[in-house]
Amino acid sequence: MKALLYTGIGQLELKDVPEPSSDFIVKVLGCGICGTDLKTYQKGHHLFSPPAILGHEFYGLVEKAPIGCGYLAGDKVVVAPYAECGFCDVCIRGAGSLCANKHYVEGGAFCEKVGIASDYIEQGVFHIKELDDVYTLVEPLACVLNGFEQLDLKPTSRALVVGAGPMGALFALLFRAKGIPVGVVEPSAQRREKIASWGIEAFEPGGAGHVESPRAGRMESALTGQVESARPSRVEKGFYDIAIIAVNKKELVSEYIKFVADAGTVLMFSGLSSDEIVAIDAYSIHYRQVSLKGSFGYALRHFKEALSLIEAHKEMFLKIITHNYPLELGKEAFEMLASGEALKIVLRP
């Protein structure tokens, strides 16, 4: 079968590789390029030694299935890239995203077919209604839902998302859908225009300029139907009580701890390397009761909730996907994503 192989930093090659020998095989119809894929391509990654097949945000058709597993050849499915064990201490405490005994899909999905272990089918494979690239967003949205779970959202909450990459954009869409006033800080004018076209206020870093949303002012929640309060026309210190850091720059964490309102929350969503140290404003933590929280990955409950949300609000989430490429143009797709011109790219075998 054809596969897009990561063969070294800055190197991707379309190669013939052996087909999976599993009893359960999914024919891949689409797989999203995630931030980890891009980072691996640009800088390498300790978990992916070349040659390796990257990609884990995929959906497709069941090509082969064991009798009695609940699936038949031709079934439409989306696959969770991993599942927690459900029995360890962190799982029992409800933090399945941190499980040390996760079960993983066998190999990446930038290829024509993916094999699924028999003992993973019940946990990690899910029926879907139709074949659509929107299902590549289930895993990213699951991670965002885990982030939401770390927040103490109130009817009066106001959120600022720092970074309008695909994950930041998902945060912004979900805040808006829940009726929570939200703004986005993003240096790319093209991405600000995109965000603004969705009715979300988008600002340049520093707050000097912004793009007027066509629906600036009061807005209606897509999920509740309630009309919520207006957004500001500029980024104002102390206005937002929630700041989502969706860019992996440690200085932004330090900056927004000082920026959020009293009793506000800063969520570190984008990961930093293990050797990076973040400077914390102790005054804000103690005297202003600002909370700093982190969010990593998802638990299966988030994946299931994300799937339900996407099937209920398909058109809203499809806005995230801006480009698709055939697998043979995978290197061009990665370069497009690196340029910042695309938001979310799907590769199709």
Q: In which residue ranges do the predicted regions lie?
A:
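C-terminal hydrophobic helical "lid"/dimerization subdomain
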Residues: G209, S254, L300-P349
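N-terminal glycine-rich cofactor-binding segment
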Residues: A3-P20, I33-E63, V78, I92-V105
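Glycine-rich phosphate-binding loop and adjacent beta-alpha segment
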Residues: K250-A312, P349
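Glycine-rich beta-strand-centered segment in the early N-terminal region that forms part
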Residues: P20-C31, H45-F87, Y120, F126-K129
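NAD(P)H dinucleotide-binding glycine-rich loop of Rossmann-like/cofactor-binding domains
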Residues: C85-V162
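Adenosine-nucleotide cofactor-binding segment
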Residues: V161-A164, R176-E255
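Mid-domain Rossmann-like dinucleotide-binding core that forms the NAD(H)/NADP(H) cofactor-binding site
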Residues: G74, E130-E204
